[in-house]
Amino acid sequence: MPYASLDLDYDKEYKASWVVYPNSNFDPKVGHYLYNTYLDELEMGEELGFDGLCVNEHHQNAYGLMPSPIVPASALARRTSKAKIAVLGNAFGIREHPLTLAEEHAMIDCITGGRLISGMVRGIGAEYYSMGANPAFSHERFHEAHDLVIRAWTDEGPFSFEGKHY
């Protein structure tokens, strides 16, 4: 979901479209139009026979207007009935706590009747930086979050978990 109104000469004034690109360049009216257009396009994918609709996560950049793929996935869950909804990139390692994401993914999976595909990604350095997380720990945070989420989805009853990060 790129911000289609990005001034193509932005590189003359800004060093990058990630992290340092100011939010003052975002127009909420354009955002309203783009978010709804992109959701309409995803819904149309099911009408055209696509068997999967994909959303992902990116933070503080002009090329990915999807800081929480759970939001569009939940909208698609109610407006589609056949296509799988693939969250191909929820950066578990930079989130507040992976159990929140485990619950949200489980909830959407229930709403869709089992059509959710949960893709867990580590995220990239710029996103760790912008979220105040040290990228040096990204691999171990991801693996710990992954293990905790899988246990939350598969273990019976309450369980204890004592990790380095969670």
Q: Predicted regions span which residues?
A:
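Internal, glycine-rich beta/alpha segment that forms the wall or movable "lid"
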Residues: 10, 99-166
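Structural motif
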Residues: 56, 88, 119-121
